[in-house]
Amino acid sequence: MKPILVHMHIYYPHLYKDLKQCMLNINTHELDLYVTMVEEHSEVISDIKATFPDAKIEILENRGFDIAPFIHVLNKVNLDNYDLLVKLHTKRDINTIPFLVNGFDVGGGKWRNYLLNFCKTEENWKKSLDLLNSDDVTMVSDYHVILKQDDNVDSKYLDKLEKKLKISYSSEREFVGGTMFVAKANIFKVLQNKLKPEDFSSSIRGSGDDLPYACERILGFINSGKIASFNGKKGVLERYITLIFKLIYKHKITDKKETIKILGIPVYKKKKN
């Protein structure tokens, strides 16, 4: 088996310990680890060098959240050298609305925990790898965060990416909300050298730049195969809850504003700068 390519983006240094535990599970295989940060966190860097001595560490400009650093890494590697790719980052706690994703409560650290779940234990990591032995599975994560296209990103950004990458997307295609997964490396070739970090604005939430969120979806849409869940799929009750949730809860983002409606009544509005 070829080495596994791992990109780990560290914005919140206090959350590095969560990623480290996942990396220790992944490290049972040969890997090439690329670590990106926007500041030089000396204690974290020292720990990475001690634990993963071959890691390549770079300090990058703070653009495009975790997506622009991922693009940076994609543009500098030869994907033919890898069978699999793992993407990890320090997902912050969610302490304000919206706190529901895919019909599930993702408040506090729950979203991060769902995203890291595929490699959080040795058993979960093995299940994820086993799924990727199937020809039709090209990406694996946790079912709580495997989503379908929605109105949470301005469609003009998706339209531009569709033309630039010469791909098509639809409301039926799935993506991993929060972009942490293990996937077959070759599906990302379509992205190589088509985007660059300079295409992204500074990482300021609510700035009106939806390019990172459009790319989040594109990472799933470029996938010609299936996004599988290592922990199965929703039960009947969970599916009904999700359906009801979608009927009563609407979250829409445009280049001008963000709106949340419950039963058609606006409960949250925020204009973008």
Protein language model features and the residues they cover:
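Short linear proline/tyrosine/threonine-rich motifs used for host-factor recruitment
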Residues: 257-261, 268-270
